[in-house]
Design a protein with these regions (language model features):
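Residue-level signal for alpha-helix termini/capping positions
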Residues: 4-7, 56-60
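Membrane-interface junctions at the ends of membrane-embedded or membrane-associated helices
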Residues: 1-16
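Short hydrophobic beta-strand segments
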Residues: 58-70, 113, 126-132
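Membrane-proximal, lumen/periplasm-facing interface regions of secretory-pathway glyco-
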Residues: 13-59, 70-82, 86, 90-116, ...
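Aromatic/acidic, Gly/Pro-rich catalytic loop(s) in extracytoplasmic/lumenal soluble domains
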Residues: 92-162
Length: 162
């Protein structure tokens, strides 16, 4: 009778909800791991591992290295990927003034300086390695030694030897 019919509909409903749930979870995971990194690569901190590797390989040639802070707080990623000794960092870093949200960030440690790097601000600084966002560096008249790209092929960083 009626109860048998309700049992079948209940089972059907549970199975249907399970299928919808599995579909949505798989769709979410696909969007998160396939599309999101291609659409918003900066949010995944892409490029920093390669950037730090390159900068570490040439840092002995420069007394100062200027790194853009356009993508998050790069000092954390530089410390992590370069395996910088914590005891050295703790004794020599400089914090910025607190912003309107009462946050500060690291502006300097060792030979590294982290700040925005529009070309008019850094172009006259010589004997320095400059890591900038691509839109901050002019297309001509600049000694771009390396470009680091996001996975989607767009430039993430331009590295200039000044």
């Amino acid at each position: 009778g009626v109860f048998e019919t309700l049992k079948h509909w209940k089972l059907f409903g549970i199975c249907a909800l399970g299928i919808v749930y599995l579909w949505q979870v798989s769709r979410y995971l696909h969007e998160y791991y396939v599309h999101y990194p291609q659409t918003y690569p900066a949010a995944w901190e892409y490029g920093f591992k390669e950037l730090v590797s390159y900068v570490n390989s040439v840092q002995d040639r420069y007394p100062k290295i200027w790194v853009t802070d356009k993508h998050d707080q790069p000092y954390i990623l530089f410390l992590f990927y370069s395996k910088y000794p914590p005891q050295n960092f703790q004794g020599q870093h400089e914090l910025s003034f607190r912003d309107k949200f009462n946050f500060s960030t690291v502006r300097d440690y060792g030979k590294f300086h982290f700040a925005s790097s529009p070309w008019d601000r850094v172009r006259d600084m010589h004997n320095m390695l400059i890591v900038a966002a691509p839109e901050d560096i002019p297309a001509v008249g600049v000694n771009i030694v390396k470009t680091i790209n996001f996975p989607n092929g767009q430039p993430a960083f331009k590295i200039v030897s000044n």
